Amino acid sequence: MMERKPLPIGIEDFKEVIDSGYYFVDKTLMIKDLIVNKVKVGLFTRPRRFGKTLNMSMIQRFFEKTDESNAYLFDGLKISEYPECMQYQGQYPVISISLKSMKQATFEEAFAVFKDLIRAEILRHKSVLFQNDAIEKTDLDRDRKSVV
């Protein structure tokens, strides 16, 4: 009898799901759709508990350039059957913002939390932002002041 994999209840990180051997419904062809349709910005709306955060994590782990390769996470999954898509794996900085923590009582509180989310993404990509000669530090300072 085949051993059953545990369900990833409450697990939102794609890497953890794959590395820990949780049951996973392969939705990696969503990545192919993003590439083929040349989607630059995606807004994923679904009811609660439909896996939005896990799918966002999967997309981020696919596209994001990191110190350690995430390519192995996609071995044996549907997207790995498309070399024309796999060439995009690990090539880009990815800005990923989940609004699931946005449950504040007032607009001001929600805005403060949203600014913190933006700030965290800016800091996460700080090395990429400041190594690009095309982006002037003054532009980043101006943009940062308008956001944070």
Regions found by a protein language model. Give the residues of each.
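Walker A/P-loop-proximal flanking segment of P-loop NTPase domains
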Residues: 1-81
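P-loop NTPase motor core
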Residues: 10, 15, 64-129
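Short, glycine/acidic-rich hinge or "gate" loops at secondary-structure transitions
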Residues: 127-139
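Conserved small/polar residues in nucleotide/adenosyl-binding loops
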Residues: 147-148
